[in-house]
Amino acid sequence: MYAYLKGIITKITAKYIVLETNGIGYILHVANPYAYSGQVNQEDQIYVHQVVREDAHLLYGFRSEDEKKLFLSLISVSGIGPVSALAIIAADDNAGLVQAIETKNITYLTKFPKIGKKTAQQMVLDLEGKVVVAGDDLPAKVAVQASAENQELEEAMEAMLALGYKATELKKIKKFFEGTTDTAENYIKSALKMLVK
């Protein structure tokens, strides 16, 4: 079991980042890979959780210990696997998540990909009173400006598909952002907030 890895981020894709430490490149599946865009070729410390399956050994990465604890709480719920837990964390509304669990807001919880009514009810049953989230330390939404071609938006939509959101949902979101320019990270944050509301 690993607590964290410290190394240099060498690659970012829609589903994972690669962290090189001591000459070994580790694939870390993270909630929002593009959140690490500003740290490529820089040293970073990423908290990790290893999942061992019959066909794979996977590492999941987190920006903080609190995010890792939230992930571990989520995967402890029957019906929520690591991919679904990352999608929930990627929504970047941890306070809203805790409030939905505490107030038994099933409608809010079912807006996450692959979370149906029964799983949402199980989340409330298993996590009510047990999930505490420290303050939301991520930056506020950045104003977007017009642009003709938008590679960042394409990368954001690809990452959203990787999180399990449907292409039909993402088409509507993409139209909303067309003609704007921003980072893939901010597009993802904004899109997730729109989808969760």
Curated annotation (Swiss-Prot):
This is Holliday junction branch migration complex subunit RuvA. InterPro entries: DNA_helicase_Holl-junc_RuvA_I (IPR013849), Hlx-hairpin-Hlx_DNA-bd_motif (IPR003583), NA-bd_OB-fold (IPR012340), RuvA (IPR000085), RuvA_2-like (IPR010994), RuvA_C (IPR011114), RuvA_C_sf (IPR036267). One of its GO terms (molecular function) is four-way junction DNA binding. The lineage of its organism: Bacteria, Bacillati, Bacillota, Bacilli, Lactobacillales. Homotetramer. Forms an RuvA(8)-RuvB(12)-Holliday junction (HJ) complex. HJ DNA is sandwiched between 2 RuvA tetramers; dsDNA enters through RuvA and exits via RuvB. An RuvB hexamer assembles on each DNA strand where it exits the tetramer. Each RuvB hexamer is contacted by two RuvA subunits (via domain III) on 2 adjacent RuvB subunits; this complex drives branch migration. In the full resolvosome a probable DNA-RuvA(4)-RuvB(12)-RuvC(2) complex forms which resolves the HJ. Residues 148-197 are annotated as: Domain III. It comes from the Bacteria. Keywords: Cytoplasm, DNA damage, DNA recombination, DNA repair, DNA-binding. It is found in: Cytoplasm. GO terms for biological process: DNA recombination; DNA repair. Residues 1-63 are annotated as: Domain I. NCBIfam families: ruvA. It holds the Pfam family HHH_5. GO terms for cellular component: cytoplasm; Holliday junction helicase complex; Holliday junction resolvase complex. Belongs to the RuvA family. Its main location: cytoplasm. The RuvA-RuvB-RuvC complex processes Holliday junction (HJ) DNA during genetic recombination and DNA repair, while the RuvA-RuvB complex plays an important role in the rescue of blocked DNA replication forks via replication fork reversal (RFR). RuvA specifically binds to HJ cruciform DNA, conferring on it an open structure. The RuvB hexamer acts as an ATP-dependent pump, pulling dsDNA into and through the RuvAB complex. HJ branch migration allows RuvC to scan DNA until it finds its consensus sequence, where it cleaves and resolves the cruciform DNA. Residues 143-147 are annotated as: Flexible linker. Has three domains with a flexible linker between the domains II and III and assumes an 'L' shape. Domain III is highly mobile and contacts RuvB. Residues 64-142 are annotated as: Domain II.
